Amino acid sequence: MAPITFRKSYTIVPAEPTWSGRFPLAEWDQVGTITHIPTLYFYDKPSESFQGNVVEILKTSLSRVLVHFYPMAGRLRWLPRGRFELNCNAEGVEFIEAESEGKLSDFKDFSPTPEFENLMPQVNYKNPIETIPLFLAQVTKFKCGGISLSVNVSHAIVDGQSALHLISEWGRLARGEPLETVPFLDRKILWAGEPLPPFVSPPKFDHKEFDQPPFLIGETDNVEERKKKTIVVMLPLSTSQLQKLRSKANGSKHSDPAKGFTRYETVTGHVWRCACKARGHSPEQPTALGICIDTRSRMEPPLPRGYFGNATLDVVAASTSGELISNELGFAASLISKAIKNVTNEYVMIGIEYLKNQKDLKKFQDLHALGSTEGPFYGNPNLGVVSWLTLPMYGLDFGWGKEFYTGPGTHDFDGDSLILPDQNEDGSVILATCLQVAHMEAFKKHFYEDI
């Protein structure tokens, strides 16, 4: 890829004074991935009227949207017991302007590659957490006239739904339109910094997501697996291929005839089985699948529209490789479906109560860079599959038209997978998955041959 020249870095602060003070975070904000999640948008050459002022439009509208989403302009601050809070101090977000001698056509199919790194603002997690911006953006102008925009958002502050809420409102303000949905900022609705109200706890506590994922048989840790070289691929599934998979899953004895399996349950079950085959596990190898659930509509009452924060939790489906491979697709899909159905209002409250009672939350946090031997790891023999199927991820328009491609920036941890809706919105999907290089060819073979 052609070299990139970084022209200038700006600190963007809210355009008007905003509330300042210490902002308690909910338990779901403080566990799991608390690093930044990058998303990339690619645009064709803007029309002549936008040629000289793309950067200014982005900066000005970003400053304005931060007035409404002011927590994003603050900084995290560590507290005792592995907790942290948000210091709403309006220190601002980072905006980088860069140029490339390359062309957008150099990226071919836009699969995440190491070349994407220079298009994304980098975060040094060795710096004190109090100094790290929670939102970073980089606009890169290419020689062909096209541009890329990378947005890197702290997962300690928001989940994907909330991040895209902010980004879409940024686009609306840039186009001269009013805010569509005012963010709901009060995290006390999830008892942030407060005790839970009394509730009846079911007799069985089964939050497997707080347990250590299985190791390979014969291993006592995952240190060696973390070191192995990985590769990311984007694998499309057409609507007809999806229909074949769903027919397979729903035709099994494990299916509920009244409901059937969802796209996510079906595709994720297929991915899980294919990964077990590709990795060459022994039949008795335990394997866990991490599933990310949006709890907004599962709470009683549901969280308010525009809730701005983390409202997702991870649940786990578990089996052995032998069970998954010897049984039909419907078996894997049924394990996933059952894990998802377990997420009720009571389940969420039990999880919050459990975390509130922990002496230290650090063991549940992932603030570690690629190559680290610390933090949660859902690589071999495990997987984590996240759905972006219902996220409003397409159509980000700042005035010069919608992007022609958007997708994840990087996804370099073994076992990490995303299921994305295809950009043509015809019901087809794309699997973005990262596996060890040694396993990928076999995985791709099974992924398509087993449909």
From Swiss-Prot:
Give the domain of life: Eukaryota
Task: List the active-site residues.
Answer: 155, 397
Q: What class of enzyme is it?
A: transferase
Name the residues that bind CoA: 160, 262-263, 294, 298, 387
Q: Which Pfam families match?
A: Transferase
Give the residues the record marks as binding spermidine. 33, 155, 314
What is its induction? Not induced by pathogens or by wounding.
Q: Which GO terms describe its biological process?
A: pollen development; pollen exine formation; spermidine hydroxycinnamate conjugate biosynthetic process
Report the EC code(s) recorded for this entry: 2.3.1.-
Q: Which UniProt keywords apply?
A: Acyltransferase, Transferase
Tissues expressing this chain: Expressed in flower buds and inflorescences. Restricted to anther tapetum.
Q: Family, per the entry? A: Belongs to the plant acyltransferase family.
Record function comment: Hydroxycinnamoyl transferase involved in the conjugation of feruloyl CoA to spermidine. Catalyzes the three conjugating steps required for the biosynthesis of N(1),N(4),N(8)-triferuloyl-spermidine. Spermidine is the only acceptor substrate while feruloyl CoA > caffeoyl CoA > coumaroyl CoA > cinnamoyl CoA >> sinapoyl CoA are efficient acyl donors. No activity with hydroxyferuloyl CoA. Required for the biosynthesis of these conjugated spermidine derivatives, specifically in anther tapetum.
**Identification of the protein by name:** Spermidine hydroxycinnamoyl transferase
